[in-house]
Amino acid sequence: MSQARHELDWLNDEVVVSEIDVVNENVIAGKLPDVIKKVLGWGYGNSTWPLGFGIACCAIEMMAACSSKYDIARFGSEAMRMSPRQADVMIVAGTVNEKMAVVVRRLYDQMSEPKFVIAMGACASNGGPYWDTYNVVDGVHKVVPVDVYVPGCPPRPEALLQGLMEIQEMIKTGKRGLITKG
């Protein structure tokens, strides 16, 4: 019994030593940071925490995306966060007016890095049918940088989920930029 245990200990030591050698080779070759970045990107991309900022009728569709029929939890976004400090994706759903633009910017500034913004619906994207009024901001992109536009008036929950998947893909691949959905 003790001899069998001794042989297993020797086997475990050899496995540990070989794993350490692999890690050392990767560190010397500079490959380990890339592997770690990919793992972290995968984990972070599959666990985005949205901050729902529903201002108008698009908020109803945003709430529908959280229901059991569409199940936003499948994409790692379990629930909308009520604090910007706990969120990394802001979903602006609705018309942003001049007074509300200050609030949107303040919430965006309070989010931790990296942070992403989804403009949901025609009103958030370009002012919608109210674009020509005196107090409506002609698109939330004039207040905060927008990463993904979700078109529609109001957009379907599936479109919001597609926009969220675009954000996740940006996180996983390390690409960040302006993505417009048509």
Curated annotation (Swiss-Prot):
It is an enzyme of class 7 (translocase). It comes from the Bacteria. InterPro entries: NADH_UbQ_OxRdtase-like_20kDa (IPR006137), NADH_UQ_OxRdtase_20Kd_su (IPR006138). Binds 1 [4Fe-4S] cluster. GO terms for cellular component: plasma membrane; respiratory chain complex I. Gene3D superfamilies: 3.40.50.12280. It is a peripheral membrane protein. It is found in: Cell membrane. HAMAP family: NDH1_NuoB. Belongs to the complex I 20 kDa subunit family. NDH-1 shuttles electrons from NADH, via FMN and iron-sulfur (Fe-S) centers, to quinones in the respiratory chain. The immediate electron acceptor for the enzyme in this species is believed to be a menaquinone. Couples the redox reaction to proton translocation (for every two electrons transferred, four hydrogen ions are translocated across the cytoplasmic membrane), and thus conserves the redox energy in a proton gradient. NCBIfam families: nuoB_fam, PRK06411.1. This is NADH-quinone oxidoreductase subunit B 2.
